[in-house]
Amino acid sequence: MEALTLWLLPWICQCVTVRADSIIHIGAIFEENAAKDDRVFQLAVSDLSLNDDILQSEKITYSIKVIEANNPFQAVQEACDLMTQGILALVTSTGCASANALQSLTDAMHIPHLFVQRNPGGSPRTACHLNPSPDGEAYTLASRPPVRLNDVMLRLVTELRWQKFVMFYDSEYDIRGLQSFLDQASRLGLDVSLQKVDKNISHVFTSLFTTMKTEELNRYRDTLRRAILLLSPQGAHSFINEAVETNLASKDSHWVFVNEEISDPEILDLVHSALGRMTVVRQIFPSAKDNQKCMRNNHRISSLLCDPQEGYLQMLQISNLYLYDSVLMLANAFHRKLEDRKWHSMASLNCIRKSTKPWNGGRSMLDTIKKGHITGLTGVMEFREDSSNPYVQFEILGTTYSETFGKDMRKLATWDSEKGLNGSLQERPMGSRLQGLTLKVVTVLEEPFVMVAENILGQPKRYKGFSIDVLDALAKALGFKYEIYQAPDGRYGHQLHNTSWNGMIGELISKRADLAISAITITPERESVVDFSKRYMDYSVGILIKKPEEKISIFSLFAPFDFAVWACIAAAIPVVGVLIFVLNRIQAVRSQSATQPRPSASATLHSAIWIVYGAFVQQGGESSVNSVAMRIVMGSWWLFTLIVCSSYTANLAAFLTVSRMDSPVRTFQDLSKQLEMSYGTVRDSAVYEYFRAKGTNPLEQDSTFAELWRTISKNGGADNCVSNPSEGIRKAKKGNYAFLWDVAVVEYAALTDDDCSVTVIGNSISSKGYGIALQHGSPYRDLFSQRILELQDTGDLDVLKQKWWPHTGRCDLTSHSSAQTDGKSLKLHSFAGVFCILAIGLLLACLVAALELWWNSNRCHQETPKEDKEVNLEQVHRRINSLMDEDIAHKQISPASIELSALEMGGLAPSQALEPTREYQNTQLSVSTFLPEQSSHGTSRTLSSGPSSNLPLPLSSSATMPSIQCKHRSPNGGLFRQSPVKTPIPMSFQPVPGGVLPEALDTSHGTSI
């Protein structure tokens, strides 16, 4: 603007200092808020002054007056002042009120008046109903064409087949201008609603929520899906933003913005803020050819106004352009008047005097102007009989998606005053929109979704991965190409404190990309600002941890049982041993009085059952245990040892297996309870936001998420969280850290790990998925979703998944899937039943032993003594052993002191007498006999030694001993039954010089008498 002012300064000075004798002088009246009108008017005069082909040596002088907006009285005063100076024509750019007042004045003074209507506050223009001239001669010419917006809107809603819609207008818009439109819409049966929008846009929607019920608000929301906005560009932008923020707008909303005057940047602002489809109607002007863009007939226009590269043309308003062409129209009229030599000099007119006559050259000048035909900045300009400029053209823009700028506007059709609508407002079929297009794709590196492939120096980067394969399949099916680039910050997208977004979502919002693809999850927050296709892969959160190292312990053999179990087993051994010892003692005492021979091991039923039971408990039934109590003890102990050994073997195998598969964390609950391992995720990611929402939700009943969030958000996430997934994976591989991230990503990291040192614990926490993000309101969304569903139905997506997540890879992820939390030692309560069985067996054995003792003692008392008795040599041997413990066995026994009482042999039964006599060949055997103690004898008897072995051994007592039945153990463990001796017989005896033989002291050796 400063450059323009400096460029205009010399010409302004020239106009001020022009010769006083100039015959061309025009006046101009502008409103104070129309600074550009003033500058463009001066620039137009300067351009014409430099053009000798039009005015030759004559120059145009001018006088400018500035008035307040909508002040007709001031406008008349300033116009009268200009007429007093003497003017050939009056050029004005005002509102309708001032224009009506100036029309009456110029009609009375016969001063040609070229009027350019201004937009009131940027709102759409309505027609100015000028007062008719009393004598039928109208000196006011409307340089700007009449308003034709009603005709364009009616054709537009007809083409769109709208039956019900709402029209919003602001306070600057004259509702009377819609009367003709409403009349025609009513005749067509259209349901049209009108609503005024205050300057405070937010108050409009706030009042809706406070005054309407839910049902009414839903009906209003449905009506708002089809809306025409008769607002200023700034007002429309605020209105759409407020509708989107209050969720009154939807993705299928269609906004039609109607305004003759809106710039390209303002259109882009509307498109980017709108949710749904946007249609814009604005006035356009024909463009000249490139080599004649600044030439209009025989006039060259300043490059500031005709060259788009200068940039100033985009800043001009429509009224500025018509103002320039109005000056050009006057110059051409002056040129023709000079050529015809029908020039009328200017006259000084006084508006106040009643006797003042109008300018006599006014009629001729008006006719010359009305016959003019020029081509200027606005195209063709000429005036018809009704003093209006009929040539006007509109363009209709619709939402589209360009390969460079994303969501954009394209020209759908045009409308002009002669041909009407040229083009179609119907959207093209979706299938034809992607054919041949090149889409801009933004991505983020995330294995295995998107990875950098091997690149050639100097060529664009190439990418590979699961998402790239999906994108290639879609591109092949839909026929489009794509250019891919990485997000500058490498993030997926997170809403910042200033409500803006970073990452790939920010790229889509700013229209720098058409779509975004990577391991991006579909979340409600992201769906509020961008669109998503159908999910092409399910999503869940997993835990990546380092595999636990194998535990080695030399005392691992004690691990299967708890310490209390080992203690009880150790205590049971001596208890059972003592009980067996006692029962053996009792059995030995009982055997002294046993008179019946014992059958073989399997001769009785209970013995056979005992053999079967021994085989069952893997001990064998051939033991010589005959006592019932002993069998109960041994049976209980064998069952106890069988159960203990079997349990030990099974639990040891399981314990050693678990020690190799030990994983301390299996669920999020386990992770929140343990304190040894830290855990976290990527800051400002979807997983981070999920845990924050769950952890800070007061209605969440599960305290697990609250505990997880406290650890994750510690120190603002700086302690445990990472900046990107790669850092989290590296940290998990080092150990003592659990990385919470997408299962698909961490599974791939575990499958491709060089050392296979990490594992994944899957834990589905949400029903989300991975999708393709597109710009908000993108028409490609449904097309992408349809193709993704087709890929799923044909199984192509499963093939791609198997390519990047093979079931059988170098690393096995299933080896830890069934592992328990840790190896459990069997506690004492697990073995309580076994110990109870043993205790019951021991108690039962004690009871049976007591009953046996009682029974045997009673039976011995009831038996009468018999002549034929048996001497239990085994008992005698034990008795002698006890005596030998008292050092008797260590004394030398003199051979001369040994006597052996003769046994009676006459009482032998015939069968017994025929028993063969056992001969011992060893003549050096030392023989001792042990007889029951007598009252007159000691514990030992002496035999008189003699030189010959055949000497008779006299009895030490003349009394004859009673008949005694003796038993001793045979070498095979059985008992020999000896016949009673009736008659004393001599026995040969050979003394042993060396003393007592050791065998004589051993109770295991039997002695035959």
From Swiss-Prot:
Transmembrane segment boundaries: 563-583, 638-658, 831-851
InterPro entries, per the entry: ANF_lig-bd_rcpt, Glu/Gly-bd, Iono_Glu_rcpt_met, Ionotropic_Glu_rcpt, Iontro_rcpt_C, Peripla_BP_I
Comp. bias (Polar residues): 931-942
Record Pfam families: ANF_receptor, Lig_chan, Lig_chan-Glu_bd
Leader peptide range in chain numbering: 1-20
Region entry Disordered, spans: 931-960
Topological category with respect to the lipid bilayer: Multi-pass membrane protein
One term of GO molecular function: transmitter-gated monoatomic ion channel activity involved in regulation of postsynaptic membrane potential
Stretches for region Interaction with CBLN1: 21-436
Record's catalysed reaction(s): Ca(2+)(in) = Ca(2+)(out); Na(+)(in) = Na(+)(out)
Keywords, ordered alphabetically: Calcium, Cell membrane, Disulfide bond, Glycoprotein, Ion channel, Ion transport, Ligand-gated ion channel, Membrane, Metal-binding, Postsynaptic cell membrane, Receptor, Signal, Synapse, Transmembrane, Transmembrane helix, Transport
Cited PANTHER family: IONOTROPIC GLUTAMATE RECEPTOR
Protein's recorded name: Glutamate receptor ionotropic, delta-1
Gene source species: Rattus norvegicus
